């Protein structure tokens, strides 16, 4: 699919073999591949075949295979792709179910289940928290959030991302961008509760 003037391709279709050929072209310059989206796990059979092909190729099997996901994949889905992946980065956009439904239109229970399952199987690379001023509820639920994080593998990185208005649309276009002071406050509250492996943005807009 392309824009009306066909000047900016929006989607490209590849077979697994074609994507492997592209991966092989750049293999000498990369340490791994990360599939993102949208939500990449919506194409789970393709991802399984792609990761499986990487792990089966002598010249590619050194590459890590990571998934950037919203965490809504079922546990059965994670079990299917787990043998061929090296890790996942998962977004937890709020702590309470009510706030998560407000922000995304869906419950976060499956996301929490995904996070726990991936951590228990040494497949959770990074847990991401998106701070949206006056919207997210991390600080209001800091005790529960910290307890949850501390129940995970201690090697997991916690990344706090700052919401910004660029590229968003709809109601979110009117939401305030997060600033450094707000991110540092959340970071400090987590550190006080023994959550230590935290990354914060280098640039704020």
Task: Please provide the spans of the model-predicted regions.
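Conserved non-cysteine loop/helix-boundary elements of the Radical SAM core domain that shape
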Residues: 8-15, 35-45, 99-115, 133-144, ...
């Amino acid at each position: 699919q392309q824009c009306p003037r066909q000047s900016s391709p929006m989607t490209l279709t590849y077979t697994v073999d074609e994507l492997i050929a592209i991966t092989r072209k750049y293999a000498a310059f990369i340490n791994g591949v990360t599939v993102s989206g949208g939500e990449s796990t919506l194409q789970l059979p393709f991802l399984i075949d792609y990761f499986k092909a990487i792990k089966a190729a002598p010249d590619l099997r050194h590459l890590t295979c990571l998934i950037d996901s919203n965490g809504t994949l079922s546990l059965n889905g994670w079990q299917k792709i787990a043998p061929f992946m090296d890790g996942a980065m998962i977004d937890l956009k709020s702590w309470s179910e009510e706030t998560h439904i407000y922000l995304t239109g869906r419950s976060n229970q499956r996301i929490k289940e995904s996070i726990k399952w991936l951590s228990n199987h040494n497949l959770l690379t990074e847990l991401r928290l998106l701070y949206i001023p006056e919207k997210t509820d991390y600080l209001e639920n800091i005790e529960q959030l910290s307890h949850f994080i501390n129940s995970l593998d201690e090697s997991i990185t916690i990344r706090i991302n700052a919401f910004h208005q660029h590229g968003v649309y709809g109601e979110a276009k009117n939401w305030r961008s997060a600033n450094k002071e707000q991110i540092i406050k959340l970071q400090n509250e987590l550190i006080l509760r023994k959550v230590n492996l935290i990354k914060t943005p280098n640039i704020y807009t």
